[in-house]
């Protein structure tokens, strides 16, 4: 996200967004973005997103509950002409459920079914994950008018330009409860 914000493609304006299970729809993550970019507050709030045909929604974070709870809203976006993509990091909770907390496999399966139903495509962090998604879709994927696009990229780390954590935020006790 930081790289996209600092180096946006010429064709696009990058607007980080977020959703929770407690509210309907996605909101701009402007407070988060200002903090991430170390920018002064300029009065922009985390308002509900505005969208139009041709926009692209890229789900970078794995947030099972928020995505599955917002599936109807994502359908509204798609029906309005917004192209939707999600990053898939792995299928390990489904492939080897015994090494994850009980129920994680069902949660991951529900999330994957949701994104494969509403998305134009998924972008996987490796060719291996893309192959796993392709195989999973053969038996678990929803019926679609158009096939789900499956791409992949090499994930890596740029330690010099990363944003390291610096302890717990001031509102940690509220977040962790």
Language-model regions: role of each:
Residues 1-177:
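Carbohydrate transferase catalytic cores enriched for Leloir-type hexosyltransferases
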């Amino acid at each position: 996200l930081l790289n996209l914000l600092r180096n946006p493609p010429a064709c696009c304006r990058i607007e980080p967004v977020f959703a929770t299970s407690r509210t309907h729809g996605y909101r701009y993550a402007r407070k988060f973005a200002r903090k991430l970019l170390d920018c002064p507050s300029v009065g922009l709030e985390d308002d509900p997103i505005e969208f139009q045909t041709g926009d692209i929604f890229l789900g970078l974070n794995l947030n099972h509950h928020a995505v599955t709870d917002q599936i109807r809203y994502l359908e509204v976006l798609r029906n309005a002409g917004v192209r939707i993509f999600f990053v898939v990091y792995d299928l390990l909770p489904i492939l080897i459920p015994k090494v994850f907390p009980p129920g994680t496999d069902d949660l991951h399966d529900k999330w994957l079914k949701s994104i494969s139903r509403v998305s134009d495509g998924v972008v996987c962090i490796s060719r291996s994950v893309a192959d796993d998604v392709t195989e999973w879709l053969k038996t678990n994927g929803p019926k679609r008018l158009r096939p789900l696009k499956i791409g992949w990229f090499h994930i890596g780390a740029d330690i010099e330009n990363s944003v390291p954590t610096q302890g717990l935020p001031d509102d940690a006790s509220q977040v962790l409860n």
